[in-house]
From Swiss-Prot:
Glycans are attached at N77, N261, N332, N364, N399, N478, N728. Residues 677-697 are annotated as: Disordered. It comes from Aspergillus fumigatus (strain CBS 144.89 / FGSC A1163 / CEA10) (Neosartorya fumigata). Coiled coil: none annotated. This is Probable beta-glucosidase F.
Amino acid sequence: MRVLSAIALVASLASSALSAPASESRVSTQLRSRDAEGYSSPPYYPAPNGGWLSSWADAYEKAQRVVRDMTLAEKVNLTTGTGIFMGPCVGQTGSALRFGIPNLCLQDSPLGVRNSDHNTAFPAGITVGATFDKDLMYARGVELGKEFRGKGINVLLGPSVGPIGRKPRGGRNWEGFGADPSLQAIGGAQTIKGIQSQGVIATIKHYIGNEQEMYRMSNVGQRAYSSNIDDRTLHEVYLWPFAEGIRAGVGAVMTAYNEVNSSACSQNSKLLNEILKDELGFQGFVMTDWLGQYGGVSSALAGLDMAMPGDGAIPLLGTAYWGSELSRSILNGSVPVSRLNDMVTRIVAAWYKMGQDGDFPLPNFSSNTQDATGPLYPGALFSPSGVVNQYVNVQADHNITARAIARDAITLLKNDDNILPLKKDDALKVFGTDAGPNPDGLNSCADMGCNKGVLTMGWGSGTSRLPYLVTPQEAIANISSNAAFFITDKFPSNVAVSSGDVAVVFISADSGENYITVEGNPGDRTSAGLNAWHNGDKLVKDAAAKFSKVVVVVHTVGPILMEEWIDLPSVKAVLVAHLPGQEAGWSLTDVLFGDYSPSGHLPYTIPRAESDYPSSVGLLSQPIVQIQDTYTEGLYIDYRHFLKANITPRYPFGHGLSYTTFSFSQPTLSVRTALDSTYPPTRPPKGPTPTYPTAIPDPSEVAWPKNFDRIWRYLYPYLDDPASAAKNSSKTYPYPAGYTTVPKPAPRAGGAEGGNPALFDVAFAVSVTVTNTGSRPGRAVAQLYVELPDSLGETPSRQLRQFAKTKTLAPGTSETLTMEITRKDISVWDVVVQDWKAPVRGEGVKIWLGESVLDMRAVCEVGGACRVI
């Protein structure tokens, strides 16, 4: 069976850009157009070479020895995908077999191996974020790395830390870890470390400003929207998680489809050359999102290193911006040989750094079919066939971690009268299709492009097939001795009600990627808004009208409105189970029946009304004319906005109840590194980078080999007449404005992976003792927020910077948690000096500790005392 999702994506690219989503008329108050704001992205050339950091020195030394002996064809092969459907993976490069480098396999997704078999479908990123558990974040990364390696995948296309969740209706928010830069940063970094510990290259994405799905891609009818972001907001919010991912040593970065400040991300020299490779010291390689390359020479000069899946503007035509055209650009001199050498060296260095030159398996699965045999290159139409699926089981015992994450993410919003946990003999009436299976069968919807049965993940390329699914219905039936099930979204008229009955109502809200439209929602939640799908609100209200005790279970991609029913006296408890993956049922019953106390916390704010958000974060729609999406709210997204506007949400960021209670005591603050200056000490100088001959290679290096058996539509580096291409080298290429080959001075904010290493000096350590003061075992989360002094200018009143989670505490027992605060954590970005500015010695900084952004338990003032609130 062909991959329907990829076909849908191709169709969407070829379709007219002149029509608005069908649901637009129903949500006109949420879809708005904006005029151009005059934002532009200044040029920054040339692209900095990699290899100047000691942490990558060995990998670059190995890469240099190989790359210096490569032909032009071999170099181009490694930078260009072979074309969509031209191999087993969603993307693969060409090879350099003389040096033992195979076609590199790149594969989704951040939660499991996409379009495969015998894999684990882990909980989604938003669920992982809700655990506030660094150990689980790392463990999931390790097991993802093991599974991808076991399938022969070189590059895992995750984690996602963008979108960050600026727009609550954004379609792909659920792939990341939550609507806060530090939560995203910690979740992303822990995941990267875990993945790469297994020798698989992680890819942090989508760089940057892809906060809406609609109109994200440029095509023949319309340019992608431009995310217009000021410099301070870019650094303090949207770059923050990418910087931490780079500091964690990530091997690859994927660009976003959209533009930033009127320049496409895949050829934005400011973003790629200056910020990513110079300021943040990124040593790996930059790839496009699939079919997100919009130019050849321009993208190479701007810092792009790999084009995926390789096709040009229209896929499956056998044409590319790179491939043979990159060979031509090298021969005619429009792309310097030095730029190509750096592109290839970055890719090969990442391959070496992960140890993939050792015993690394080749792909043993196919994204294109579930059959054992089939065409090796399905996009060619006429393709040799062979074994494409070996059905290698990579699951091991990873279901244990998957269940632990799904369980520890469950967030208890409300528990009146301590109705939870339930007893096994309670009389239960269970309502809602979200409790049951997909009636069409497991994995019946390609890339989860439907909302049928329990919602385990959103839809799109960020999904994986479920190897199995234990539904809430199955799990409850297995445990409860007295449960009746009504797997319908319309409240039945014939339900018998007894005085002791507990109604458990399941509702959901879904979203996903733009190439699939589900129930009128083209990725973003346009038709549904922030409401529950499938009559969910009415189902809860109808149950509340009949039963005196109602428990609501919510599976959702993000914030969901609850005002229609949350204050009804019958609605006693609400659990948000997020997107639990394959362990949806068991993880829920672990908490529902009290084997574990809930310990999840909201990774976003739940508002009382959608109008509580700033108007600038609504979805935008403007057919034909390019959309200008200007970030006028600046630093104030999610809870930061609610605090600034003095709006009380329904449930604040970080909120989460337990079956027990906790006290915070004995807060302490200690100085680790004295901050004796406003700005960090001078950055270390760059080390040497690999050097190569810069002469244009002989055209014969990209001539077609004799008796070569070509695959139709496969993207090769070869030219029919390479000598003719070389003869055109005297022509002057129309380079981008500001293009130069003269290197820029090293930015003062750089110096290592993630920036100036002094930014990550630990300035303070804060400790607090957490005690279980209740009657049941449980785990607590301490959230650390900083409040910066007025001397730094206007800043959000509280910003999450760290968190820590206790082990399971028995009643009456305690644990002391310690969290570290870096110089960067208490800094703001100085747009004039272009560096991070902190108060000297941290004077005026307050450090808040609590269980949510609105539930503070202790505060420490730098230079003063700590106290319990």
